[in-house]
Amino acid sequence: MKRNLYFLFAFLFTLTLTTAAQSLVKTVPAKIPDPDLNALKREAVTEVDKMQTLTQQMVDSIFSFSELGFQEYETSKYITGILEKNGFKIERGVAGMPTAWTASYGSGKPVIGFITDIDCIPRASQKPGVAYHDPIIEGAPGHGEGHNSGMAVNTVAAIALKKLMEKNNLKGTIRLYPGVAEELVATKAFFVRAGLFKDLDVMLGSHVSNEFATNYGQPAVNSGLVSVQYNFHGRSAHAAGAPWSGRSALDAVELMNIGWNFRREHLRLQQRSHYVVVNGGDQPNVVPSEASVWYYFRELDYPHIKELFELGNTMAKAAAAMTDTTVDWRVLGSAWPNHFNKTVAEVQQKNIEAVGMPTWDDNDQALAKALQKEIKSKVEGLKDKVTPLDKPKEPQGGGSDDVGDISWNVPMVYLRYPANIPNLPGHSWENAIAMATPIAHKGSLAGAKVQAMTALDFLLNPENVKQAWEYFNTVQTKEIKYQPLIGEKDVPAIELNKEKMGKFAPELKKLYYDPTKYKNYLEQLGIKYPTVKN
């Protein structure tokens, strides 16, 4: 009897423990394993590859729009339509610019930004795939910088990321921005002032190039600038009958330019300054009562840019005093020198090397070599190797890009993706030739893969974000803090290029790419790829 009671007690005790254990298992959820970063990157590449046709269509469509800075209405409508259709929340007209917008998906931290430019170049109209000068519309704007490809890169990357975030329940936010009027260096300082980047953890920029590369620090061939228009006001009179009654605003413009040109000898070698007269009066027999000149003052750092700007103001006031006119000025745009983040660049470089260069075929190389020969540059075709990480070098000065203002407010890099031909002059019809061809399509697809992979590195690894900000705070901005070059009362010059686009838009619209009828823009234009001189 005792033995039976013992076994009964043991059975009940074991049953109680088992029930308690099962209850405990039910109340404590199993730990969800962390996502496999490498597996997600492979999945991102697969998703991007599925959008090869979308990439080509975006590159070709934006090429066909050919819109100048501040007039990118069709371009912005097209891009935001694609993003909205794919579940992104759009905010239009940001920072006081009708063609500016943001597109967001997700919630919470980290917040990863994507930015790339969308405007084109005056007088750069060119038939794609034709290795000599042959404009689509004579005198019209064209994508002679290749900005038509960047939004394909960032949009395709963002859509791929969204799919992965939904599927794998990944936390964080991705947000896209357009580089409006970059060729005027006229908007990103206003974006900063409007607070568009205040919550960003990392910004991933992209820009067309002939190489696959990234860098950190200040690029060797980069300057900051301030863009200023000086407006002189005089008094009109009959230029022959009573010139003594007039006060020539044009005389003031000319004296300012003469004074500046004499002063150049006594400026630092690193400075670059240039001007165009945007209003020289109406006709010779009327003393000009109004005249304007537009200056770019470029230097290597904020103090020297500010110094040039103040010197320009002094020259303008002196010219006004000499001619008994008055002067005022307006800052049209500005750019801090670029400074890119070491941590973000090192992470991005690994992804560039993982993706590798596109595979160019004989037609791609034939176009590249024929164009290089046509313009008498070095004939070497397209690059076939990834560029090693570009480390800081002594700045020498050069072109300017207003992403510099962003780079001094949030850790940022610029992916240079291989969608164009080496050894071209830039800002010209030559640079438009490859930009709606398989060269641009392949390079943009490769760029989208790197953007998506790099975003995953920061979405899934908080340590990367932490290290990026450590570099930003303890190295980049340790001694230099961002100060805007635009004033509190300055506003975006959204009226610029309106007249030029009004002239060419009706003809351009007739030639917008129609992907429902044509496989690509080359087919629509009836261009054999490549078309080269015999």
Residue ranges and their predicted role:
Residues 22-143, 152-172:
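Acidic/His- and Gly-rich active-site-bordering loop/insert found
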Residues 1-23:
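Bacterial Sec-dependent N-terminal signal peptides
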